[in-house]
Design a protein with these regions (language model features):
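A short, structured beta-strand/loop element
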Residues: 24-49
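Aromatic side chains
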Residues: 11, 21, 41-43, 56, ...
């Protein structure tokens, strides 16, 4: 399998909320790293993860994540 084919099979996101949601939904995490202050989470099965990422945006999980961010901003 070539690098290009592998990239088409993975799903990558810098978003911690989406990454947590994908884990809860049973997606397999391949890589988790932080570089230059930016997160990177890589999962297998791009199609499944892309579908679930869209589901996340319309879910209560997303609302919960937004509320956490707002609370953190209040106490900074």
């Amino acid at each position: 399998m070539h690098d290009n084919e592998i990239k088409q099979e993975i799903f990558e996101t810098p978003d911690l909320g989406i990454a947590a949601f994908l884990l809860v939904k049973g997606c397999k995490l391949l890589v988790a790293e932080r570089s230059k202050g930016r997160y990177s989470f890589v999962f297998e099965d791009r199609t499944k993860c892309a579908t679930l990422a869209l589901e996340y945006v319309n879910s209560d999980f997303s609302k919960f994540d937004a509320a956490l961010k707002n609370l953190k901003n209040l106490i900074r």
